[in-house]
Amino acid sequence: DSQYIYSHLDWEYIPAKVIGLTTHKQHNYLTINKGSYDGITEDMGVVNQDGVVGIVSAVSERYALVVPLIHTEMNLSCRIQTNNYIGRTHWLGLNSSQLQLEDISRHVTVNKGDTIITSGLTPVFPSGILVGVVEQANLTNSDNYHHITLQIAADYRKLSYVQVIHNRATHNIEYHTNQSLWSGLEK
């Protein structure tokens, strides 16, 4: 499908077990039982069968630390599936099953039940992975942006196994970007 930035062949999924997890702090983390020995690196996406879980932030040889969506400094580029408008998620630190969807302009139609998916605009996640569903969308006359609450797809209270996403195309993107930069400097 031409809307995807990367081919499905560009993505490899590495299974891992969650061996540590917090859900009641402002800065929550997950620990998984896979690390650099298994091909895990920083900035890899993490999902489960329900949707997006988080992003790898630190790696040792046998383990990795994951920043989940329920971390107050985590933002994720996503889109409304029905109209393709792009926003970003933000967790307020209150409810481990809810996120805020920000940067959706007032002229965009947003309905309860709308599906929110990854945008595919970064090399971390392919486009179309479920993030959550719109639970509430409010707009006052003075607002330029919607106030949108999402029900997170992944249930952190039942998290046991995840998959770490390796984007095989990332190396090619970085190589071609660097080649373009260097070729421009040589002239």
Residue ranges and their predicted role:
Residues 2-187:
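A secondary-structure micro-motif
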